[in-house]
Design a protein with these regions (language model features):
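Chalcogenol-based redox active-site neighborhoods
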Residues: 1-157
Length: 157
């Protein structure tokens, strides 16, 4: 599958979310949506990323944006992650990996000489019309949430 690019329509999704219920991209039409994909709840980089987005949530909201984190973890895992770290972002559970695949972030990775399938840490900014307005792949966590916020503010202006 071709990688998503700026200007492409963002694939819609409906996923079970932390706290019960579901989260759907289409339910936020008219708003900017930050969709960030991360490998695993409560691991070092993923925790820093989630807490960074959480600390900036008021600024994202005042710019008219919502934040959705997605990983292949279970809802139960998400609930524990949210409770442990006081997260304010929505977390979608993609155990089937259909959304991960639709966004092209479920990829072959390698560590210590072994290859395996996993999530490539990536973020997509979806505009009010449902089109991709920003793409960050192979994200390095330090400063990432701030960079995404600046992009949101630039689009909101």
């Amino acid at each position: 599958m071709a990688e998503l690019s700026i200007g492409d329509m963002a694939p819609d999704f409906t996923l079970p979310r932390d706290g019960g219920g579901t989260v759907s991209l289409s339910s936020f039409k008219g708003k900017q949506v930050v969709v960030y994909f991360y490998p695993k709840d409560d691991t070092s980089g993923c925790t820093v990323e989630a807490t960074s987005f959480t600390s900036l949530t008021p600024e994202f909201e005042s710019s008219g944006a919502v934040i959705i984190g997605i990983s292949p973890d279970t809802v139960k895992s998400h609930d524990k992650f949210v409770a442990k770290h006081g997260l304010a972002v929505m977390l979608g559970s993609d155990e089937e990996k259909t959304t991960l695949e639709a966004y092209g972030v479920w990829k072959e990775k390698s560590m210590y000489g072994k290859t395996y399938m996993g999530v490539e840490r990536s973020t997509f900014l979806v505009d009010a019309d449902g089109r991709i307005a920003g793409v960050w792949r192979k994200v390095k966590v330090p400063g990432h949430a701030e960079a995404v916020l600046q992009a949101v503010k630039g689009k909101a202006a």
